[in-house]
């Protein structure tokens, strides 16, 4: 069974993330969307909320599940018997950073491969940070995040403001 891990903060998940998930689900037997627990980074959504949002937007994709993890990605991958890391690339600067991470992960575990997937051009400008800013200033996020979670995001940002 070919298990792939799609790690990230997903704070919140965007249409760009979902596009990568859908495409990866056609290539791998199982895709685990893994929310990284980073104690140094305070997100808008809690880790549990992010996992629930991912579950909500991927509920119709049978071979996708969402989890959280803490620690080294390579250790988590061993636990899940996964050999592939999926990374979405929007721009060249994403590649430069992700290439360094891929080399580090390969150094830590030579059996791990990183698969880079180009983001659909229509999502190349999207980031979770930009979504939060648009909502904070009263803008519309339709088409930027999955429709199923628009209200969740607006409600959360409304409470934080």
Curated annotation (Swiss-Prot):
Q: Tell where it localizes.
A: Cytoplasm
Q: Where does substrate bind?
A: 9, 41, 73, 87
Which InterPro entries does the annotation name? Answer: Cyt_trans-like (IPR004821), PPAT (IPR001980), Rossmann-like_a/b/a_fold (IPR014729)
Q: What is its main location?
A: cytoplasm
Query: Required cofactors, per record?
Result: Mg(2+)
Which Gene Ontology cellular-component terms appear in the entry? cytoplasm
Keyword line: ATP-binding, Coenzyme A biosynthesis, Cytoplasm, Magnesium, Nucleotide-binding, Nucleotidyltransferase, Transferase
Q: In which pathway does it act?
A: Cofactor biosynthesis; coenzyme A biosynthesis; CoA from (R)-pantothenate: step 4/5
- Marked site: Transition state stabilizer: 17
GO MF entries: ATP binding; pantetheine-phosphate adenylyltransferase activity
Q: What class of enzyme is it?
A: transferase
Question: Domain of life, per the record?
Answer: Bacteria
Query: Which annotated residues bind ATP?
Result: 9-10, 17, 88-90, 98, 123-129
Give a GO biological-process term.
coenzyme A biosynthetic process
Record's catalysed reaction(s): (R)-4'-phosphopantetheine + ATP + H(+) = 3'-dephospho-CoA + diphosphate
| Enzyme Commission no | 2.7.7.3
NCBIfam families annotated for this entry? coaD_prev_kdtB, cyt_tran_rel
Free-text function comment from the UniProt entry: Reversibly transfers an adenylyl group from ATP to 4'-phosphopantetheine, yielding dephospho-CoA (dPCoA) and pyrophosphate.
Name the family the entry cites. Answer: Belongs to the bacterial CoaD family.
What interactions and quaternary structure are annotated? Homohexamer.
| HAMAP family named among the record's database cross-references | PPAT_bact
Protein's recorded name: Phosphopantetheine adenylyltransferase
Taxonomic lineage from the root: Bacteria, Bacillati, Bacillota, Clostridia, Eubacteriales
The gene designation is: coaD
